[in-house]
């Protein structure tokens, strides 16, 4: 019974993780973002934006 509980718990955790990852539309790499913005003589950072039911991780140059 305890093994069944552990299996169900892991299944729920993995499913939740997949749902969260499935709603992230774009990923931002901080080092790539800084390099991209450095060419424009600006500072770059990754920001998180929410639009509808999706999450966007974008690079923003300031």
UniProtKB/Swiss-Prot annotation:
What subcellular locations does the record give?
Answer: Secreted
Where, by tissue, is this protein expressed?
Expressed by the venom gland.
Cystine links in this protein are 28-46, 33-59, 37-61
Signal peptide stretch: 1-18
* One GO location term (cellular component): extracellular region
Keywords, ordered alphabetically: Disulfide bond, Ion channel impairing toxin, Neurotoxin, Potassium channel impairing toxin, Secreted, Signal, Toxin
Q: Which GO terms describe its molecular function?
A: potassium channel regulator activity; toxin activity
User: What is the role of this chain?
Assistant: May block potassium channels.
Swiss-Prot/TrEMBL domain comment: Has the structural arrangement of an alpha-helix connected to antiparallel beta-sheets by disulfide bonds (CS-alpha/beta).
Report the sequence similarity comment from the record.
Belongs to the short scorpion toxin superfamily. Potassium channel inhibitor family. Alpha-KTx 23 subfamily.
> Per its record, how is this protein called by name?
Potassium channel toxin alpha-KTx Tx308
